[in-house]
C-alpha cells in the first residue's frame, strides 16, 4: 500500500512539474523490482495512468524491471533512471552513507517523492 501511494505521488509530481505547453515529449523511467513483484505492478499502473493523458502533459512514462531498492538508488545516482521505488531503510542508508553505501558516501541529492 505504501509503495502504491508512493508511486501515485510520484506520478502526480511529475505531471505537475511539467509546463503547460510542450515543445516536445519528455520521457521518464521508473525503476521498480522483479516483474512478478508489487513494485513492478505499481510502477506499471502509474505509467499507464500518466500515459493515458500524455497528450496533455507531454510526459511518456515507462516502467523498468530492476534488481530492487539498492539497484534503483544507484541507478538514479548514475543518472540512468528518473525515479525508482525503494524501501525507506535503503533510502535512509543512501542519504547517510551507511551500510552498502558507505564506500561511495552520502547521496545528498536523493529525494523522496512520497513514502
Regions found by a protein language model. Give the residues of each.
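Absolute protein N-terminus
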Residues: 1, 23-24
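Bacterial N-terminal signal peptides that target proteins for export
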Residues: 1-9
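Absolute N-terminal positional cue centered near the fourth residue
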Residues: 3-4, 19, 98
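Cleavable N-terminal signal peptides
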Residues: 9-11, 21
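Sec/Tat signal peptide C-region and signal peptidase I cleavage site
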Residues: 16-23
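Short, glycine-/small- and polar/acidic-enriched structural segments
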Residues: 24-115
Amino acid at each position: 500500500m505504501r509503495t502504491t501511494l508512493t508511486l501515485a505521488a510520484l506520478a502526480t509530481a511529475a505531471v505537475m512539474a511539467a509546463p503547460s505547453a510542450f515543445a516536445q515529449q519528455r520521457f521518464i523511467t521508473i525503476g521498480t523490482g522483479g516483474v512478478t513483484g508489487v513494485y513492478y505492478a505499481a510502477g506499471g499502473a502509474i505509467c499507464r495512468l500518466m500515459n493515458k493523458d500524455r497528450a496533455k502533459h507531454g510526459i511518456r512514462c515507462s516502467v523498468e524491471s530492476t534488481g530492487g531498492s539498492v539497484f534503483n538508488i544507484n541507478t538514479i545516482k548514475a543518472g540512468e533512471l528518473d525515479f525508482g521505488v525503494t524501501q525507506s531503510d535503503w533510502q535512509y542508508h543512501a542519504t547517510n552513507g551507511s551500510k552498502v553505501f558507505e564506500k561511495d558516501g552520502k547521496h545528498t541529492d536523493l529525494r523522496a517523492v512520497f513514502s
